[in-house]
């Protein structure tokens, strides 16, 4: 979707000047993977409007294929408005209801060519938007699973998009069982499973067929990993002196972790790369501006 970022500090409803960007957890992930040199296709649906064209132009400019970005003549492209803050989390307003993507349907997926596809990344956000969108994401994950494609799933909870906590947990957990890698934050895991500690949260998903559970512990607490063969790892985070914008940190972690897995690195090294890219992302304003190239990543990890 498109993102209107306030150019002045203050409540969104009182401001007049905004700059237009492109955002979204899945898009941030696609940008990050492309910057690391991976061949990336983006799956979405946009309106026939300036925001939709802006998104497609942005994808092409970042080397991301838009063959699977379908258009909808009858519904608009969704967008967000985000406050400008000096530090910490900004307030974000979502305009998502009745958008083109909320009318995403399983039939839209018929044109996908799975030849040569190694990995699919999904977040829980689309599952909240509509019943048809939910059915489409389930279908996408089942088809990828059937083709032997590795699937990573970041719950990326947005409680304000759901009718209730109970529905959110049920739907997110139903989707998670199709994934090979599930990557919740610690508080997300608690909310979704009712479990308190990271080991039990991981066990909840492992019992449902997930192969690897990666729990982002938050702040300086690093990452906890548990696998289906009951291997456990703890990987520290990187220290950041000045946090500019925390939005996109989780997407950066997902980029680092899954790209490292695709490169054949160990789970521990994958978590280190994820932590590094997450740390780089929060030092720059914007959702994906801080996502690095391989060269920038190498310099950061060498100097950290």
How should these model regions be labeled?
Residues 1-65, 243:
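Glycine-rich phosphate/adenosyl-contacting loop at the front of the ribokinase-like
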Residues 142, 194-304:
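Conserved phosphate-binding/catalytic region of the ribokinase-like
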Residues 33, 185, 250:
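Short, conserved phosphate/pyrophosphate- and ester-handling motifs at nucleotide-, phospho-/glycolipid
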Residues 31, 79-83, 222-225:
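Short beta-strand scaffold segments in enzyme catalytic cores
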Residues 119, 125-204, 221-222:
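Conserved beta-alpha-beta core of the PfkB/ribokinase-like small-molecule kinase fold
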